[in-house]
UniProtKB/Swiss-Prot annotation:
Signal peptide: none annotated. Required for mitochondrial cytochrome c oxidase (COX) assembly and respiration. This is COX assembly mitochondrial protein 1. Pfam families: Cmc1. The lineage of its organism: Eukaryota, Fungi, Dikarya, Ascomycota, Taphrinomycotina. It is found in: Mitochondrion inner membrane.
Length: 104
């Protein structure tokens, strides 16, 4: 069984699709004359599907890697920002402590 055959969607297999369609117009389809073309088409469609799946997996891995890198960058930026805020608060508290000592 194969998916709906569309020359536009399965461009790599277009010649085989056309050949099978032509073969099916004759009575040879009832006597197995189209079987060879059908098997070649099935192999072509399988290869096409596997190639697309491989590309999709590679793209997903790349997207996942980019997302992970962005997440790590955001974590680093957040740590830096948190450290700066803490340093500023420490400076303020030290300045307030120093100002309090001068008043006594």
């Amino acid at each position: 069984m194969h998916p709906h055959l569309d020359v536009n969607n399965q461009k790599q297999c277009a010649d085989l699709i056309r050949a099978l369609e032509e073969c099916h117009k004759s009575f040879g389809k009832f006597f197995g004359e189209c079987n060879t073309i059908k098997y070649e088409l099935k192999a072509c469609l399988t290869k096409d599907r596997n190639d697309k799946a491989r590309l999709n997996r590679e793209n997903a891995r790349m997207r996942k890697k980019v997302i992970e890198e962005n997440r790590k960058k955001e974590e680093i930026e957040e740590r830096i920002l948190t450290d700066r805020i803490l340093q500023q608060e420490r400076k303020k508290s030290h300045a307030n402590e120093g100002a309090g000592d001068n008043n006594n």
